[in-house]
Amino acid sequence: MKSCEVNFDGLVGPTHNYGGLSYGNVASQSNSQQSANPREAALQGLAKMKALMDLGFTQGVLAPQERPDVSGLRRLGFTGSDEQVIEKAARQDMPLLVASCSASSMWVANAATVSPSADTADGRVHFTAANLNCKYHRSIEHPTTTRVLGAMFADAKHFAHHPALPAVAQFGDEGAANHTRFCRDYGEAGVEFFVFGRSAFDTRYPAPQKYPARQTLEASRAVARLHGLSEAGVVYSQQNPAVIDQGVFHNDVIAVGNGEVLFYHQDAFLNTDPMLNELRDKLGRVGGQLRAICVPRAEVSVQDAVRSYLFNSQLLSRPDGSMLLIVPQECQANASVWAYLQRLIADDSPVAEVKVFDLKQSMQNGGGPACLRLRVALNDTELAAVNPGVIMTAPLYETLTQWVDRHYRDRMSESDLADPRLLSECRTALDELTQILKLGAVYPFQLN
């Protein structure tokens, strides 16, 4: 049976703004309080989805969250009608309202960790929604994420859904942004690679000093247990605390993997050689051969990697066995990064081509191509069981671009978030979206 890896990209929500909410994410903080363009952001994301579909890749779409999060504001003590709740929050605690309007769910690499059926004990695809407990604006996402994923992957014969881990620092979980799977073929057993920033309970592991390490070893181990992964099919590796302190808040900012290839910066990991040996050995036992591409710090600094989001790229397998690297245009604008990429494709490397995309609206908020997608490896039977409404087609692309043009504003600043009309605009848009994507009732306003 054939298998493929499907990229489900996050659709940017109508409240996209530059709130500067993510301490440790350099781009997010440096662009704080600039005016954003939600319409342009959503269209840029859709253009990437359409382009990959046109290249022959199976492409899906993941719906945004309901924002402003009125129910969350009510839990924090604001009362009255929905409009009054927003008005009071704007008057009494504007930073909280900004957090409650975040469109950060667009970065669906943080939505969940996914293990394909070839790796799991029960032969189903497993999903665990990430608790994202490091930041309030992201910690409120997982209940809706769980419902949306449940509506997309509804057949319990093929798909298993786990609730988020306990929302405490010891089990901080950031989803697939710290998880990669290596395999010879998507339908064969592989090795799942979990990267953590610190250990909650074992003081032998170092930790960053400036910025928080968002993923714990304990969370990664818990997800592996929930998914029924064997020890022989899992490798845990610690991210270098020094690069976290330079703005590498997730592993997908400093490394990317696909198939048998790990593309990483020289400073990405602690204890790199033992990690590579374990990965090479375990992948070899399931018929694979690891190809590690190390980018030397002498050619690309960590600072340039973070500025350009070189590693927050998509590494995609083409039918001929070569790979395509999808990068943001910031890579082209960075001389050392672009020079390195030209050498990479000229050398005898698996990466045969680099394609550049304009994702400026997302990039300025701290998310590149890899942040915007959740990878799900599926065989033909499982793919047929996915809700067909979320698989990108030319007609769906046209429908969604028209939907964005109808409902999204072209400017969003902090003061706009207090506009009581924004709530009704967003709910009208999302109600229509659930019909377009055939999701049913997934949003709080639809369930109440």
Swiss-Prot record:
Q: Which family does it belong to?
A: Belongs to the succinylarginine dihydrolase family.
**Subunit composition and interactions:** Homodimer.
Q: What organism does the record attribute this protein to?
A: Pseudomonas syringae pv. syringae (strain B728a)
Gene3D superfamilies given in the database record:
Succinylarginine dihydrolase (3.75.10.20)
Specify the superkingdom. Bacteria
Described by its record, this protein's role is as follows: Catalyzes the hydrolysis of N(2)-succinylarginine into N(2)-succinylornithine, ammonia and CO(2).
Q: Where is the active site?
A: E174, H250, C371 (nucleophile)
> Would you tell me the protein name for this molecule?
N-succinylarginine dihydrolase
Pathway, per record: Amino-acid degradation; L-arginine degradation via AST pathway; L-glutamate and succinate from L-arginine: step 2/5
Q: Give the keywords, sorted.
A: Arginine metabolism, Hydrolase
Q: Name one GO molecular function term.
A: N-succinylarginine dihydrolase activity
Gene Ontology biological process terms in this record: arginine catabolic process to glutamate; arginine catabolic process to succinate
Catalytic activity, per the record? N(2)-succinyl-L-arginine + 2 H2O + 2 H(+) = N(2)-succinyl-L-ornithine + 2 NH4(+) + CO2
Q: Where does substrate bind?
A: 19-28, 110, 137-138, 214, 252, 365
Query: Under which EC number(s) is this enzyme classified?
Result: 3.5.3.23
The protein's matches in InterPro entries, at most eight in alphabetical order, are given as:
AstB_sf, SuccinylArg_d-Hdrlase_AstB
